[in-house]
Amino acid sequence: MAKNYPVVSAEYQEAVEKARQKLRALIAEKSCAPLMLRLAWHSAGTFDVSSKTGGPFGTMKTPAELSHAANAGLDIAVRMLEPIKEEIPTISYADFYQLAGVVAVEVSGGPAVPFHPGREDKPAPPPEGRLPDATKGSDHLRQVFGAQMGLSDQDIVALSGGHTLGRCHKERSGFEGPWTRNPLQFDNSYFTELLSGDKEGLLQLPSDKALLSDPAFRPLVEKYAADEKAFFEDYKEAHLKLSELGFADA
């Protein structure tokens, strides 16, 4: 979709760059890239194409949205970011949370996802139940990412590769463990591990395995496992799209 980005002031652009530097330092020091990426994704992934509600507009800071079951643990991310936000009040929460996701990928060795500022904070959080359910298969993934958010099959598989970062926590999701050997390194190992089958100590969710059994998803898994550069290019595009759902639509 064509975008018509708002023009922001020089002062605002400076605030964005200052926030970027502070985020780099925080994420490197606290090893919290996976948490920040999850915050950005869960903020944006509530967008609904048909009603034009939800999306990356800063509502994650509200107790109502933080209380959604899919967001268990994200209150930690919101608390960690608040001192930086207080220091840089010019930047919107909407931009700040999406910038945190972009910086998380970059600090972990992933691609440089483009960032366009100008999202405005919205007051009302989206209803619960719009984020993907890890226990379900490819039809569910297409319903949430495709029909609801307006993303493609390629976007679904590329974004799944973001699970190269982080781990599941039983008290948050009911699942336990990392997807890859180095959960702080952004690379294509999610796909190589997925293709090599179950291994002790590593996690494969039903929604991960769905990528192997689906005839449209599997070739993309194989492509990204064989070619990290191709994965980075497609991931960058998918992350950008996700971070701008409902923002600056021309």
Swiss-Prot record:
| Record's note on what induces expression | By stress and hormones. By infection with rice blast fungus (M.grisea). Circadian-regulation. Expression is higher during the light phase than during the dark phase. Induced by hydrogen peroxide in leaves.
Q: Where is this site: Transition state stabilizer?
A: 38
Miscellaneous note, as given in the UniProt record, is: Binds one cation per subunit; probably K(+), but might also be Ca(2+).
- Catalysed transformations (reactions): L-ascorbate + H2O2 = L-dehydroascorbate + 2 H2O
A molecular function (GO) held by this record is: heme binding
Concerning InterPro entries, the annotation shows: Ccp1-like (IPR044831), Haem_peroxidase (IPR002016), Haem_peroxidase_sf (IPR010255), Peroxidase_I (IPR002207), Peroxidases_AS (IPR019794), Peroxidases_heam-ligand_BS (IPR019793)
What is the pH dependence described in this protein's record?
Optimum pH is 6-7.
Q: Does Oxidoreductase show up as a keyword for this record?
A: yes
Family designation:
Belongs to the peroxidase family. Ascorbate peroxidase subfamily.
Q: State the EC number(s).
A: 1.11.1.11
Residues at which heme b binds: 163
Gene coding for it? APX1
Q: Name one GO cellular component term.
A: chloroplast
> What SUPFAM superfamilies is this protein classified in?
Heme-dependent peroxidases
Please give the activity regulation comment for this entry.
Answer: Inhibited by p-chloromercuriphenylsulfonic acid (CMPSA).
Q: Which Gene3D superfamilies match?
A: 1.10.520.10, Peroxidase, domain 2 (1.10.420.10)
The organism named in the record is Oryza sativa subsp. japonica
Which positions does UniProt annotate for K(+) binding?
164, 180, 182, 187
What is the protein named?
L-ascorbate peroxidase 1, cytosolic
